[in-house]
A protein has these predicted regions:
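N-terminal secretory signal peptides that target proteins for export/translocation
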Residues: 1-2
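Bacterial signal peptide processing site
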Residues: 20-22
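C-terminal, beta-strand-rich globular interaction domains
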Residues: 206-257
């Protein structure tokens, strides 16, 4: 019986590949972001690896911690609007600490801890003060910033924030191969592997209309699988942003922190 199931899955995979060859996916509208992998490497390159012990213990910044404005060295088509800097506080949460990013007026001293934020004061959403260069790359970089900006200094449960941007089919296949070669949770079964191998239109693409930018990217999380994430961003400030997700391949590592 097991051999029959394996044969059927293998047949389904081969049949799927044949269908892709005979009936190729429809041509996509927009501009493919060919340097996706280079951009992600640049962002990963500025993100810190280790969390300062003093920050974990107290939640108080003492100087020398990560400066999130360094993101704009990697994402060169983004910046904060005039009069604002990107900043964060680090509330201590023993179930999982993570940075809370906010747009800080440049004439306002930074808060060194979450306890310094006056009661009733809302820090605001940093995305609301992002300046986006009105080109395809700018809107792609917005999506990168939206996903990756808070993925540093993560502790315990905060590591559920593991969303990855998948730049092409090779990257998708590498995720499967890497997952199945390690002993971290569940592996991709044969059916899931076949679904990933059959994915099409993985590369990020940006389409500009008269008033909007539409960004399509594929993402992966160990707690959900592969998704197609579509951003619709108005091209004029203030930018209205709508995000929709479509699950392409379901997967769950089964790990619970």
């Amino acid at each position: 019986m097991k051999k029959q199931i394996t044969f059927l899955i293998a047949f389904a995979f081969v049949f799927s590949l044949a269908c892709q060859t005979l009936v190729p996916p429809p041509k996509r509208e927009g501009t493919i972001i060919a340097d996706c992998a280079d951009i992600l490497r640049a962002v990963n390159g500025v993100q810190p690896v280790d969390i300062p012990e003093s920050l974990i213990e107290s939640g108080v910044k003492q100087g020398g911690e990560f400066d999130p404005n360094d993101y704009f060295k990697a994402l060169t088509h983004l910046s904060m609007r005039d009069g604002y800097a990107l900043d964060y506080v680090y509330p201590i949460d023993f179930l999982g600490s993570f940075p809370m990013l906010y747009p800080r007026p440049v004439d306002q001293p930074p808060y060194v801890s979450a306890a310094d934020v006056p009661e009733g004061v809302k820090l605001g959403n940093f995305r609301d003060q992002l300046a986006i260069e009105d080109v395809e790359q700018g809107y792609f970089e917005y999506a990168v910033m939206d996903i990756m900006a808070s993925q540093f200094y993560l502790v315990w449960h905060a590591n559920y924030n593991d969303l990855l941007i998948v730049c092409d089919k090779d990257a998708a296949n590498e995720i499967v191969d890497d997952t199945n070669s390690h002993d971290f949770g569940m592996k991709f079964d044969l059916a899931q592997q076949a679904q990933v191998r059959a994915l099409t239109n993985v590369e990020p693409v940006v389409k500009l209309t008269d008033d909007s930018a539409i960004v399509e990217i594929v993402t992966f999380t160990k707690w959900g699988g592969f998704f197609r994430r579509t951003y619709t961003i108005s091209r004029s400030f203030p930018h209205e942003v709508d995000v929709k997700g479509e699950n392409l391949v379901e997967y769950d590592c089964g790990i619970m922190f």
